[in-house]
């Protein structure tokens, strides 16, 4: 029902100076709200009754975040500020992406995962103990790295997947991946982006994880459970064997 929806659900699409934002139910802390950009009327539609609605809203900058990427919206009658994001944002370089989102201060690295084949079986690998400053240096030093224009036309040989947070804009456990052929890929801001940092840089990062971090391998077990003739109400999925391979 319409009256049970939040303002960000009712009035999700917001257009400001030709840029299309999509509001999400993530609060922007008052101390992160910058100067007011404009006041406007936002529109929403109840698809069940085909009724249309309008509401007043104020748009603000988010401190240290480019308005090309995101802004804050405050709806009339609502004291909270909400994130609204521009999914159509397309940076030209990795440096622009870093600066526009203040990634040095807003991006958090969580888990580092990979996969490898050993003795004919695929194994998932989890790395721990990575120095976050070293990771940043290895992956983000080339600020002139160009953004890929036609990402959908390329096939990437993925090497490492990094779980990242950008909580200021409402992202938790999002993917930032590194390919063996030298690309960084991410879906931050809701659309795929890729930057070419070069094969040498990618190999340097992979080598750092392999040689300087602790790695634990998990064997993928696709075997069928042995049939015993007895039914069970529990899960029949086979367990996953795990063992440490590097201290």
Regions found by a protein language model. Give the residues of each.
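Function-determining sites in protein domains
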Residues: 1-247
